[in-house]
Amino acid sequence: CKECKTRYRADNLINDFTNSNLGDTLTNEERVSYIKDNKVPCPKCGKSNFTDIREFNLMFKTFQGVTEDSKSAVYLRPETAQGIFVNFMNVQRSMRLKVPFGIGQVGKSFRNEITPGNFIFRVREFEQMELEFFCKPGTELDWFKYYKDKCKDFLLSLGIKEENLRLRDHDKEELSFYSNATTDIEYKFPFGWGELWGIASRTNYDLSRHMEVSKEKLEYLDPDTNEKYVPYVIEPSLGVERLFLTVLCNAYTKETLTDGTTREVMKFTPALAPYKVTVLPLVKKFHSEKALELYKELSKHFMTMYDEGGNIGKRYRRSDVIGVPFAVTIDDETLNNQTVTVRDRDTMEQITLKVEELVDYINKKMEF
């Protein structure tokens, strides 16, 4: 922007302006024309006065050793995938694997983003989880559909609300040059729809290019048919930070209760909650000794909190706001007959259980 000197990606400007993925389908010339014709405003200053589009290297460049010349130039990896491709034959032979099979990796990636933002949604250094699934040519679209469904089911198992998820297939103009099919799983963040998980059919482009440059054979010999081929690849790629952000946004809830008060609560699915249970003595003076005893026992099985300060209602709220699924209250009944009150975070309903039943009860609720 010439007015406020803020840099933006042209495709993101158009996407945000239209609340669609139109910017991804246009050429640079078409993007410039669209921005001018529609007077797309700068998100910061509101003016529509932009420079022409400039090419921008998304890879971080540095130098290895003490000299800074072209021979010592190196780049931080923008994805983890290529390390898997160059090790394809090594893994296949050492593990004696038959196609189809997959190789997964978790690691740091680096991208020189023009406009990082929206908390941890777009950052320059991030943790990436990628799977390269190698399959026989001709079967890749069946596996592509399989992983689309598998990835969505995984997100639903984390408690992500289905109404905030959508699968968006890339059209031909938007497809990367190496792909014959790509789908983004998008989540409806507070700032709008954003890509969470990309599933791409990368054909055999990567292995073929590594073969071409390295002169090493990366072909697979099918032991059943004696057929030799370069496998096709299905790649589900997920950023850990974006998944964390999705889980946080999905869990945050602000509720108005029947008495007119409001409460803020993180409704994590119990398996994902950082703390599983909080132990609360009803009256510190009379119940804290028994409560501490129970706290130590539960801590052997779960991440457990202990809170004895303030009235019980405020302690429930403190537990709710950090997403603890279960609050166990120790009272006179505990001292007399070894029963406790267990409060559910989401429904606020309470039940009475024997102390010896607690671990099994919580474990069952946390089944994933």
PLM region spans:
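NTP/phosphate- and nucleic-acid-binding module
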Residues: 2-368
